[in-house]
Amino acid sequence: MDYLVKALAYDGKVRAYAARTTDMVNEGQRRHGTWPTASAALGRTMTASLMLGAMLKGDDKLTVKIEGGGPIGAIVADANAKGEVRAYVSNPQVHFDLNEQGKLDVRRAVGTNGTLSVVKDLGLREFFTGQVEIVSGELGDDFTYYLVSSEQVPSSVGVGVLVNPDNTILAAGGFIIQLMPGTDDETITKIEQRLSQVEPISKLIQKGLTPEEILEEVLGEKPEILETMPVRFHCPCSKERFETAILGLGKKEIQDMIEEDGQAEAVCHFCNEKYLFTKEELEGLRDQTTR
């Protein structure tokens, strides 16, 4: 079962998050029909976005957008404080041979010439936006760079996805380790050593380690678990939302749809759900609109 934990370690000097996201990423793969390299890029982004979302409170939410100039195009993910994520890639059917390390070549798919941006909606008039250059294209390093440079928190982000031969997801998950102000050098050195030796996160998930056990493996001590929450792929789109969008087009455009196709199909970018509007429904919407 997928879930996320929030924890503290080293007497509160270290804040940590870890998640198993295999089912969540599998749902993203199923909905978008991503090929393996695209699945890894989408899954890593979803997992990192989930953990960033877990740092929010209440009804706050955020959007992550990665545009690295690679063949995959843009990756966009929405996450909230409730463990819900939805995401898509511009070009889901991207796959390359494994890289020199024998891993899915995410860097080649994402590209290294572009930006990673995070827009937070904290319920205020203004959105908070942070943007950094892509430094690696492998995504874990890029989210690390975002946290360090845009949010000024010394951090380490690990995200990983393993894909089955039939394109379904074998394992997915991630962790974020953050140092609180005033962390002593001894603690920093110990954590850096652990991070340099730890197995890839996807391998730890595949072995069956829980998020709690992953943090213990990464931190070198048993963390204090503050909160556990279920996580899932969730898109709040609905036919009503698309009705509102169609109404916004105005009478003439709706009439054009009726005359040209006799119906309309709306597709949600984020979850690929399709909504069909019949001729009668379109006529009803046309008659409702004042534009």
From Swiss-Prot:
InterPro entries: Heat_shock_Hsp33, Heat_shock_Hsp33_C, Heat_shock_Hsp33_N. Keywords: Chaperone, Cytoplasm, Disulfide bond, Redox-active center, Zinc. Under oxidizing conditions two disulfide bonds are formed involving the reactive cysteines. Under reducing conditions zinc is bound to the reactive cysteines and the protein is inactive. Gene3D superfamilies: Hsp33 domain (3.55.30.10), HSP33 redox switch-like (3.90.1280.10). Pfam families: HSP33 (PF01430). SUPFAM superfamilies: Hsp33 domain (SSF64397), HSP33 redox switch-like (SSF118352). GO terms for biological process: protein refolding. GO terms for molecular function: protein folding chaperone; unfolded protein binding. Its main location: cytoplasm. GO terms for cellular component: cytoplasm. It is found in: Cytoplasm. It comes from the Bacteria. Disulfide bonds join 235-237, 268-271. Belongs to the HSP33 family. Redox regulated molecular chaperone. Protects both thermally unfolding and oxidatively damaged proteins from irreversible aggregation. Plays an important role in the bacterial defense system toward oxidative stress. This is 33 kDa chaperonin. It comes from Bacillus subtilis (strain 168).
